[in-house]
């Protein structure tokens, strides 16, 4: 193994990106990726710690020092194999995981210098493998047991990937016409190209995972029939119901949930209209309510659809924005106007109920709340009207209650999430497991992957003891 650099000797390798002026005009991916030399240089910054704290921050338990060490030996395909031992979706995770809050936050190098760019190295390795490697056939003895996975998002795919390696017969049911869940309908092409998701799904198919699309458990398929057909079931149905702010005018024409807006553009390709059947209205001035990753995706999508002015309306300050730092930075580069310390009071409309603006309450930060974030407090008598012709609400989502309503034996919380055993993913119904946003509420892709893997282990333990 080549010697690692001394602490701080090599600066963090910045990944090149397309210019804001260029990328505002299309949906092509923004980061250009590391070259082999950049990846090699970045890998040398890793100290190969005896106690790898970075791994403590990875829900998928990727062996981070080991895959980076293989990059340092320029064994890029071996590095990809090492990641895929525990994570079936490295191309997605390398692009959309909040590494600054997880693995990179715990990087020892980061205590004094910039942390090792773990996410960018994962992205490099995944892309290198896709371009240079042939998929290896999975060789595993089948155990004769069948598992049904409901929902083909990150949690379901991760669960399927682990179970197929353990010898189970795995069938994934998906309500939509495309596999990938939020990776396909929620995250824009410029952040996660759909061909990458399709590639990783194809690898799962080659491993033996079976997929059935346009299948809605609880509607087109009876849940009890599924329980009889399969030895275990995993619920990875996500959190697809949008939350709204409940202010006057929310029913006006020109108000969208981020879910609808992004699904039209991402899943149905509306930005290509009239080449595709699904249209999208190209608004001139757009306000996005919220400050998370979905809000960033929505505002940057509006920019690419030709909006002259796009606002983020957020009730706290820049410091409290929950979105990934990279997404915030890219949105600012692309000209999005961030209106901090503003909360929506009313959506304004004309005589035909078309949106003409949003009235906001000026806020200030008060004492910290239960999560440690300072609570926004209204500044009495101070409001601001912002002229827009569209409002996109991106303040969160909740799980679809369809299965829970059909199967009252499945215990849920007040928020509609499944009650599970945190260690195994087991629900209140024997043989039924759950994970991802359906169990924890709207969260990140990597947390969903971690949940899917945990449930796969729980299912294996459960069926091994039957």
Language model features: what each stretch is:
Residues 251-283, 368-442:
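FAD-site-proximal beta/loop scaffold in flavoenzymes
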Residues 146-171, 295-303:
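N-terminal Rossmann-like FAD-binding beta1-loop-alpha1 element of flavoenzymes
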Residues 48-73, 92-125, 171, 178, ...:
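Iron-sulfur cluster-binding cysteine motifs and their immediate structural context
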């Amino acid at each position: 193994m080549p010697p690692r650099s001394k602490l701080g000797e090599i600066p963090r390798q910045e990944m090149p990106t397309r210019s804001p002026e260029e990328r505002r005009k299309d949906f092509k991916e923004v980061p250009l990726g590391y070259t082999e030399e950049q990846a090699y240089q970045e890998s040398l910054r890793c100290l190969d710690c005896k106690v790898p704290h970075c791994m403590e921050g990875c829900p998928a338990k990727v062996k981070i020092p080991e895959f980076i060490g293989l990059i340092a030996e320029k064994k890029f395909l071996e590095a990809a194999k090492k990641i895929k031992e525990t994570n079936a979706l490295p191309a997605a995770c390398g692009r959309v995981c909040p590494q600054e809050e997880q693995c990179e936050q715990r990087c020892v190098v980061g205590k004094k210098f910039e942390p090792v760019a773990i996410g960018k190295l994962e992205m490099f390795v995944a892309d290198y493998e896709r371009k240079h490697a042939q998929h290896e056939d999975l060789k595993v003895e089948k155990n004769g047991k069948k598992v049904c996975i409901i929902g083909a998002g990150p949690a379901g795919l991760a669960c399927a990937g682990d179970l197929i390696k353990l010898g189970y017969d795995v069938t994934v049911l998906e309500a939509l016409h495309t596999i990938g869940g939020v990776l396909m309908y929620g995250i824009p092409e410029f952040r996660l190209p759909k061909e990458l998701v399709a590639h990783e799904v194809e690898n799962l198919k080659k491993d033996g995972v079976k997929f059935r699309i346009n299948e809605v458990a609880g509607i087109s398929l009876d849940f009890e029939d599924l329980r009889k057909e399969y030895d275990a079931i995993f619920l990875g149905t996500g959190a697809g119901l949008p939350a709204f702010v409940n202010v006057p005018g929310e029913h006006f024409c020109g108000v969208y949930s981020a879910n609808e807006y992004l699904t039209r553009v991402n899943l149905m390709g509306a930005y290509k209209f009239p080449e595709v059947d699904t249209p999208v209205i190209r608004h001139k001035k757009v306000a996005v309510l919220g400050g998370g990753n979905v809000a960033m995706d929505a505002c940057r999508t509006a920019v690419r659809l030709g909006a002259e002015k796009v606002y983020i309306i957020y009730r706290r300050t820049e410091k409290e924005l929950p979105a990934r730092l990279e997404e915030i930075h890219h949105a600012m580069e692309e000209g999005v106007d961030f209106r901090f310390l503003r909360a929506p009071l009313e959506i304004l409309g004309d005589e035909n109920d078309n949106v003409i603006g949003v009235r906001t309450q000026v806020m200030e930060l008060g004492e910290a709340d239960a999560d440690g974030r300072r609570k926004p407090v209204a500044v009495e008598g101070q409001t601001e009207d912002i002229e827009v012709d569209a409002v996109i609400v991106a303040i969160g989502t909740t799980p679809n209650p369809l299965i829970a309503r059909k199967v009252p034996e499945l215990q849920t919380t007040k928020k509609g999430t499944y009650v599970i055993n945190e260690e195994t993913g087991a629900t209140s119904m024997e043989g039924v497991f759950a994970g991802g946003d359906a169990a924890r509420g709207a969260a990140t892709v990597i947390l969903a992957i971690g949940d899917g893997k945990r449930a796969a282990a729980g299912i294996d333990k459960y069926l091994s003891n039957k």
